[in-house]
Amino acid sequence: MYVVYAIRLDDYVGRSLSPSQALLKVGVSVHDVWYRLDANERFEGKNSYRALFKKIEVLGQKKFDTKDQAEAYEKMVLAGLGKKDLSIAETVKGVTELRVETPGRLETLQALGLLEG
């Protein structure tokens, strides 16, 4: 099983920027988003999401049977969110596209079925 997830990253403590708004990260993982966050922390250490952001909130995740299905859905979601807004100085595996959270982007996640609640 694969999932496409959306997480909110807030209170960045890295070295390249001080965003006043939360950031959105959309990605693909095996199992679930928690597996991805745990693996990221285990392998990335000081450059993990949990080390670089004080607040991490799972906004939603959607299950797929195959990696191809998940990647196609992720591509559609990323296109719907528009171009990435920024990059951080630290190299974090899997973090190539961050976007500033906006009401419009949250509406897009909701419309595409990726925002829980």
PLM features: what roles do these ranges have?
Residues 1-117:
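Non-catalytic accessory segments flanking enzymatic or RNA/DNA-binding domains
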